[in-house]
Regions:
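An exposed, glycine/acidic-rich loop-and-rim segment of catalytic or binding clefts
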Residues: 1-334
Length: 334
């Protein structure tokens, strides 16, 4: 594994980039800032192709509001109203998405420099979020491990707390298997027969709605451009897909299929231990520098806004417990 100085924070703190290489040709570049995946090169007939959106220097990441390639936490996705109640006590959070908290608040995990250590084959990144950070209770120690395994990128997440809290971790890589252009010609399948409809703030209503007979039925390979403009109220709310698909009723100890994407000779399979995956089609990318819908995210996670929905799988983490999950991105020829 190689490393180099990627840039410096405004206070002068160094940020390093680490390059993981597999003999089969898969290469990943990960930076300490936000534990972000800055590039992922996949072997193709003509050489290699970078299939994620990212920057070559640190400065654009410091101004990035799209969470490009970042680990999102301590609570990925949205919490309605920027508040929740746990064990009878209400906690008020920093809000950064209207009146709601998105991806952990104004200064979530994506905006911190993580400690990094390598054993030569994997990269372990650690971040300690203090009690009260963005309003969340408990000191939370989070570790994310990146490793390459043949044709796959494997990401493991682990977290521990010293006081009851809520945790939802995900990865916000934007994929474009063509390496350029929009993702409208990408074909996708999602292994879910239900999804979570949302309100105007993109907060789940609490319903688990069957996908059958709707624009959200992606159980078979479907060209994104053929579905994203369907006459569907939910698609209009999100400006496209920005919805959570239900994979299982509870986390699984072993990875299960979540999604499959194909474009320009590359197929990507996503497998996870998590109960859901958020499909986001880059509807809010503004064109500086990445244009509208030029990347798609498959954010494996627990359900958004779970603290307000007792019927959803719990995201509560207590002292003595360990949060753990794994997501695998496997690549091959289409």
């Amino acid at each position: 594994m190689q490393s180099h100085l990627f840039g410096r924070m405004p206070d002068g703190a160094p940020v390093h980039a680490y390059t993981l290489r597999d003999p089969g040709g898969l290469t990943a570049c990960v930076i300490q800032y936000g534990a972000r995946l800055a590039a992922l090169e996949v072997p193709v007939a003509a050489g290699v192709r970078n299939v994620t959106l990212g920057f070559e220097t640190l400065e654009p990441y410091l101004a990035d509001g799209a969470h490009l390639g970042a680990v999102a936490g301590r609570y990925a996705n949205r919490i309605a109203g920027g508040r929740f109640t746990l064990d009878g006590r209400e906690y008020r959070l920093s809000v950064n998405n209207g009146n709601n908290t998105l991806h952990g608040g104004r200064v979530g995990f994506a905006h911190h420099v993580w400690q990094a250590e390598s054993d030569g084959e994997s990269l372990l990144l650690t971040h300690v979020s203090p009690d009260g950070d963005q309003g969340f209770p408990g000191t939370l120690t989070t570790q994310v491990r990146y490793r390459l395994q043949g044709d796959a990128l494997v990401i493991d997440y682990e977290a521990r707390t010293d006081a009851p809290t809520v945790v939802n971790l995900t990865h916000h890589a934007y994929f474009n298997l063509a390496g350029a252009g929009t993702v409208m010609d990408h074909a996708i399948a999602v292994a879910a027969d239900r999804y979570l409809p949302v309100n105007a703030d993109l907060i789940p209503t609490g319903e688990l709605r069957p996908v059958a007979g709707t624009a959200f039925d992606l159980r078979r390979m479907t060209r994104i451009g053929d579905r994203i403009e369907a006459d569907d109220a939910q698609l209009r709310l999100g400006g496209g897909f920005d919805h959570c698909f239900v994979l299982a009723d509870a986390p699984h100890p072993a990875v299960q299929p979540a999604a499959r994407v194909e474009a320009e000779g590359i197929v990507m399979e996503v497998l996870t231990t998590e109960p859901a995956v958020q499909l986001y089609t880059g509807n809010f990318l503004s064109g500086q520098p990445f244009a509208w819908r030029t990347g798609l995210c498959l954010e494996t996670q627990h359900f958004p806004d779970s603290p307000h929905h007792p019927a959803f799988p719990s995201t509560v983490l207590r002292p003595g417990q360990t949060f753990w999950s794994r997501t695998v991105y496997r690549f091959g020829a289409a």
